Amino acid sequence: MKFFIDTANLDEIREGVELGLVDGVTTNPSLIARENLPFEELIAEICKIVDGPVSAEVISLDAPGMVAEAKKLASIDEKVVIKVPMTAEGLKAVRQLSAAGIKTNVTLIFSANQALLAAKAGASYVSPFVGRLDDIGVNSADLISDILTIFDNYGYASEVIVASVRGPQHVLDSALLGADIATIPLKTIKQLTKHPLTDKGMEQFLADWEKRTQ
């Protein structure tokens, strides 16, 4: 399973890379807005840090606008993947971008039907949002399972990026189901390293060692 880090903060990305756990980066307009650098400059800086896909999202609502933005973003670096919203216009854009050899990540997916349409349009990645579904009482694990089954049934090459991850349980669920990728904040990456029994064991080992050296 691959881990992408869900942030546009350069320091967080560097820290994740230093841990050896980051295979790519996902950003969105909200994350970009928190940073001080201009959008395209920020994406270029991220691409220098990470040896993997970097998702950058278009903000146009119509297909021609999305395609124009996408081509500009894709020219920044070959690592750039274009995030496109799951709309009818978005699907038109994905079809055109796919034909032009530009990789796409269809975002804001909340149903298996949406994922199916994105894959059929030629999306390189689809991003179902698990946390937001769980927030409204929908079992997001069922969605991931359905998407993976559909893609397997028809041999779609689109990779599933589990997004809107709230914590370690979402990562575990995604791994158990066989999702290709989870995109997660640095905070959650750090949480994955923790277990109270690990901390307790370390404390005991150190205490025993100190007794030995006294």
Curated annotation (Swiss-Prot):
It is an enzyme of class 2 (transferase). Its main location: cytoplasm. The keyword Transferase applies. The active site is at residue 83. GO terms for cellular component: cytoplasm. Its EC number is 2.2.1.2. It is found in: Cytoplasm. CDD domains: Transaldolase_FSA. It catalyses: D-sedoheptulose 7-phosphate + D-glyceraldehyde 3-phosphate = D-erythrose 4-phosphate + beta-D-fructose 6-phosphate. NCBIfam families: fsa_talC_mipB. Transaldolase is important for the balance of metabolites in the pentose-phosphate pathway. This is Probable transaldolase. The gene is tal.
